[in-house]
Amino acid sequence: MDKLDNINKAIYDQYRAVVLCANFSDCNQVLTTIKSIVCHNRFIKFYVINSDFPTEWFVSMRKKLAKLACQIINARVSSSLVSNCKTDSSYTVFLRYFVADFVEEDKALYLDCDIVVTRDLSSLFETELGDAPIAAVKDLGGEVYFGEQIFNSGVLLINVNYWRENDIAGQLIEMTDNLHDKVTQDDQSILNMLFENRWLELPLL
């Protein structure tokens, strides 16, 4: 028997939330990331924020993940909502803005869908966020190319309560509408501007 199946669920107050954002054309990448996570973790609730994944995909995934003590949620954002946002990039860059609209847990781990997880994530979820809106890994190229310390938006431990109470989605959308043609790194630039000097640094994974 997989030793992960022997983990006592009682050690967790609730499922740990992992957020992935994609359109259906990237479903293979989403699947690869999910597989890598469940190889090393149990009691994960996956939120896939999307606008076009078919319901049948989630039905199939729920059956498979239930055997691994995991869940998956179809966090559907209407295409009309994201199409109203101004951007020079794919609308999928906006999807992570809506984390607090769907996630029930106090914190959530957002991962880009090109990430492969190679270890237990428990210690990461135990990070105390306090009043910080996010914890993130420093982007090593920030000081070299931009002369400033910035974070990489591909891995974010999100303080969901903070996002909800402070309407972070609304702030991000407004900033994107106003600045999308003035920034160099799309949504990563916007996130860094909003959370400047307010984010916690995570160790390199």
Task: List the model feature ranges, each with a label.
Residues K45-D52, A136:
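Short internal beta-strands
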Residues L111:
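Catalytic metal- and UDP-sugar-binding loop of GT-A-like glycosyltransferases, i.e.
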Residues A108:
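Short aromatic/hydrophobic "clamp" motif used to bind/position activated sugar donors
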Residues S36-I44:
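Short, acidic, metal-binding catalytic loop of nucleotide-sugar glycosyltransferases
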Residues E56-F58, K63-F102:
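Active-site-proximal specificity loops/subdomain of glycosyltransferases
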Residues I150-L205:
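Catalytic core and acceptor-binding pocket of nucleotide-sugar-dependent glycosyltransferases
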Residues M1-T32:
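N-proximal low-complexity "stem/linker" segments adjacent to membrane-targeting elements
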Residues I115-F146:
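Conserved donor-nucleotide/metal-binding helix-loop-beta segment in metal-dependent transferases, i.e.
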